[in-house]
Amino acid sequence: MKFGVDVPTCLAGMAYPVPFATADDVVRIAVEAEQLGYDEVAGNDHLSTQRFVREAWPAAPDYFEPLMMLATIAAKTSTVRLGTGILVLPMRDPVLLAKQVATLDQISGGRVTLAVAAGGYRDEFEAVAPDLAEANRNDLMTEGIESLRVLFEQSRSTYDGKYRRFVDVESYPKPVQSPLPIYSGGNGKGAIRRAGQRCEGWLPAKIGPAELAAGRAKVHGYAREAGRDASAITIALQSVVCIADTAAQAREKFRQSTFQLFRCSLNDTMLTGVSEDQYIADSLIGTPDEVCEKVAAFQEAGLDAFSATLFVADTIDEMLDQMRLFAKYVLPAFPEGMAR
């Protein structure tokens, strides 16, 4: 089992208060994650403040561009992998994105994992890309991934899709890794299908072991239909960590944190029908022993990695304390990770 940390590139106002982290704080968290033995650090992606965040806070949050932050982190680290958790692909021009990601892979010596998804907030997408407001985002996802593949792998690239088009693009340098791992982020049918048909990994968020096992089986089914090696596809998960001395203390810490705002913002999308109690049960919330038991249950369900893990906190010091507790009690119980 491998474990990653979601550094707060674009989490203020959502999972954390406003203000929360400076750019220096984001780098400091990533450096400590490597020192603690985590396998990955990942940044999430927003280009504009979402409506629910504007309504909740009087000041606008700082959203740091994740690839630029990861480039800075690459210069301060040596072994930890650099991920996105996730990058909203429909909001990105694929030619520019391919250049940015290939450059980051070169800077880091081949440490990049690119997790992409359609994004959870329609209002943000329509604000940033109004010309694509009526576009099918599943189609945008497919065209985006296909575009990245040809740009990464062909000496000269042409792509003629419904939404994405470019002609005779010669983009160098290529990534160090071939293929550069692309994960399909999301819990829905389209994300699962793309993971099996086109990607090196599947990265859902905030689901329990049973749902993960069912999704994994579907990913493998799509892979076999496409003639791919299903066993080569990484099954990752973005989960939430809140550790305390007692289960009641952990639940109360979660309920009193800013993270509740984030959970409620997803009630009409990926968390439809998921109660607070079920959310807590599915997340890594509890005592150290309870969290280890939950990790073991996910491992039994076929999980390979906890990627872009979110640590419940209302200050940087609280976030670091949670990371340290997890590293002290959980990482040693699952020693297969690269950094351990």
Region roles according to the model:
Residues 55-83, 140-147, 151, 320-340:
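Alpha-helix-loop-beta-strand connector modules within alpha/beta enzyme cores
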Residues 2-21, 89-158, 206-217, 264-265:
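Flexible, glycine-rich active-site loops centered on histidine and acidic residues
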Residues 3-7, 41-43, 82-84, 112-116, ...:
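Hydrophobic faces of well-ordered beta-strands that scaffold small-molecule active sites
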Residues 1-76, 178-180, 339:
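N-terminal beta1-alpha1-beta2 module of alpha/beta enzyme domains
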Residues 9-24, 86-95, 175-187, 241-244, ...:
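Active-site mouth loops of central-metabolism enzymes
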Residues 40-67, 88, 206-209, 307-323:
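Glycine-rich, proline-tolerant flexible connector loops at the mouths of alpha/beta enzymes
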Residues 33, 37, 45, 73, ...:
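Conserved, mostly hydrophobic/aromatic
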